[in-house]
Amino acid sequence: MASNGSFSAQRNANAGTTMKRRNDNRGYGGGIGCYQEERNRYAPPQKRFRSQLQQQFRSGHNPLYHYGSNTNNNVSRVSSQSYNNYGVDVIASNSSFALPNNDSNTNNYQKPFVVYGNPNPQIVPLPLPYRKLDPLDSLPQWVPNSTPNYPVRSSNFVPNTPDFTNVQNPMNHSNMVSVVSQSMHQPIVLSKELTDLLSLLNNEKEKKTSEASNNDSLPVGLSFDNPSSLNVRHESVIKSLYSDMPRQCTSCGVRFKCQEEHSKHMDWHVRKNRSVKTTTRLGQQPKKSRGWLASASLWLCAPTGGGTVEVASFGGGEMQKKNEKDQVQKQHMVPADEDQKNCALCVEPFEEFFSHEADDWMYKDAVYLTKNGRIVHVKCMPEPRPAKDLREPSRVMSVTVPSVAKAILC
């Protein structure tokens, strides 16, 4: 059908007006207009399509659109379905779309108009402008310099190589030289005062580094020329004492590097404590280490060979008596035994106290009756009797016993 058909007058009459769109109730279940109030309240808002621009046709006239469900073999559908409430918009199949910038016959473009009936008209995309490329045959072809395959017998043969000696170098141009010279960093010119200051700072820095290297080379603790150096914190010494020896004994504070040495040291502490407890239980005093420093009398008597001289205490006789009493009390105490809480002779309980020196609970004024026997009080202990000499003959003592008869007579 031609573009100037019978419907052109109706289309032109409605060109400046907006036609009312029908209610779209597809998929709701009711007919057109059913439950319109509920649908407008609960249904989600529908997307409204904006009017699109119609493209130009080769004929130069507006396309003919039909409103209705007309099935014609000479027309092609653009955008619709048979079950919707919209009219079927068709376009004549014999009219073809024209591509812009390719039709040299006409340059007049149609004005945009409102599409009637179809809310989503189909738009034909426009191609991008292009430039016609040259064919491959017109491109330059690179032909390398080929050397002959036959062997060269002449010693004066020179291969066919390009000569670039006569070609001008663009970098040697005067303008290029000026640009390169401007882009290069120019040397910084410093004043004399600033140069002297920088040299002085560099000399001081070098001096400090040399002193630090000399101090590191000397052993720690052997340089006493500068008293302030004794207060310097030596990180190497601290690291060797703490970081290099992380394991420390909780009893004496000795540090070790590995776990094996630490375990051996702890075993030695256990054996020492057991031996001390055994000796105190047997009534023997544990052996104490000698004093760190000798007394003045020992120093005076040592050159003459007089031996050790006991030094009198500063407190006089009272202090000496108190010390002797304390020593006696220390001798008369034994480790506490849960099986023997009462004296074996008087059956009275012992006085128990904790000794910080022995690090154990002890019985006060108590001794062993025998070496491994019962525990008794010191006051309950029988006095020792002198042993008789069996080699001497026993002497018969004469005892005068008054006769019974004489006593009776008197």
UniProtKB/Swiss-Prot annotation:
Gene Ontology BP annotations: mRNA 3'-end processing; termination of RNA polymerase II transcription
Gene Ontology MF, one: zinc ion binding
Keyword Coiled coil listed: yes
Record's subcellular location: Nucleus
Record keywords, A-Z: Coiled coil, Metal-binding, Nucleus, Zinc, Zinc-finger
Zinc finger (C2H2-type): 247-269
Family annotation (InterPro entries): PCF11-like, PCFS4-like, Znf_C2H2_type
One GO CC term on file: nucleus
Highest taxon in the source lineage: Eukaryota
Short name of any one Pfam family annotated for the protein: zf_PCFS4
Skewed-composition ranges (Polar residues): 1-17
TM stretches of this protein: none
Subunit structure: Forms a complex with cleavage and polyadenylation specificity factor (CPSF) subunits CSTF77, CLPS3, PCFS4 and PCFS1.
Protein known as: Polyadenylation and cleavage factor homolog 5
Organism from which the protein derives: Arabidopsis thaliana (Mouse-ear cress)
Taxonomic lineage of the native organism: Eukaryota, Viridiplantae, Streptophyta, Embryophyta, Tracheophyta
Gene: PCFS5
